[in-house]
Amino acid sequence: MGRVLIIGAGGVGTVVAKKVAQNSDVFTEIMLASRTKSKCDKIASEITNVKIQTAAVDADNVPELVALMKSFKPELVINVALPYQDLHIMDACLEAGVNYLDTANYEPLDEAKFEYSWQWAYKQRFEEAGLTAILGCGFDPGVTGVFTAYAAKHHFDEIHYLDIVDCNGGDHHKAFATNFNPEINIREITQKGKYYEDGQWRETEPQEIHKPLTYPNIGVRESYLLYHEELESLVKNYPTIKRARFWMTFGQEYLTHLRVMQNIGITRIDPVLYNGVEIVPIQFLKAILPNPGELGENYTGETSIGCRIRGIKDGKEKTYCVWNNCSHQAAYQETGAQGVSYTTGVPATIGALMFFKGLWRKPGVYNVEEFDPDPFMEQLMTQGLPWHEQFDLDLEL
């Protein structure tokens, strides 16, 4: 049954490999591949109950990817590499006849802009090949889309207002660090904000709109409106939505560091000449910042991510909140990774489970909310990300 190729051996790749191995009744063999094979070997050395192989692969090199896929013959690729590499991996999957799952949408290397159009354009090719591509199956995007689908299926006739709220209430005890790839993280939060309202996308300056929100078990945190990719697919798949926004918490110290780095130009994504060599400042910054995959040991506190929804059921307005809280220490004790990596890697594993069980499998390219949310929601409870819900309360939004 489940031969799976995992591409990427950072914090999320670590979690995916270990969670896949925990589900050995479904997954029978793993190939873990990354540009740096030694990182894969280290992860593989900690997995004993499932057959696991490792390989070095350049995820920008389609022929190399195809050769690996044809050699190992996986049924599914779990892509937890960089968003710049999504299209290369999808191309390789089509050539090798392999199904596909990722956790983040494509972003061009030379432009801080992400959208689904590039990947949605693959729909016909995946249909014709009889292959499934599951997009954005982390937490946000991913679980947030499943939460929305679950709310639409069970609690609303029409969803009108959707706010996705993401709080990291943890402390990694570093002056400055990002919780996932620094280059991707900084590009995401320094670009302009955007939200959907009354059929239009409205743009804001970075961190222009913010307000205090209360997060379960954490308390009040200042939350900033920014653009996040799942908004694009959710307003497409739920056309009754009148407004959709995404909020994320940042501490003042984090924002001050970020502002200084922007002001001195080290977050630039265009090449500069240094000692006769072209370097990209943000890539240099990534090299000297703490590795997100190594933050877990001293990380305390928890994350809280969820959806706050207002809409209509049986002609009456109602509100609904659904969320998960994840302890950094519990995540580290189970997988050796911090909570942000854990909350991305576990849903990717569940998405793969849904595929192998035949529950999320149909030719084409799909976002997670286009599948039945119920079996995924059940697996969240048993795989380490239990969720909670409340009805008819003040959404603060």
Labelled PLM ranges:
Residues 59-73, 85:
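Conserved Rossmann-fold cofactor-binding substructure of NAD(P)-dependent oxidoreductases
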Residues 36-38:
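Helix N-cap at the beta1-alpha1 junction of Rossmann-like dinucleotide-binding domains, i.e.
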Residues 104-131:
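Rossmann-fold NAD(P)-binding glycine/threonine-rich loop
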Residues 153-397:
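C-terminal catalytic/substrate-binding lobe primarily of soluble NAD(P)-dependent oxidoreductases
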Residues 12:
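Hydrophobic/small residue at the entry helix of a nucleotide-binding pocket
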Residues 47-61:
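Rossmann-fold cofactor-recognition segment
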Residues 69, 75-79, 100-101:
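N-terminal Rossmann-like NAD(P) cofactor-binding module of classical short-chain dehydrogenase/reductase
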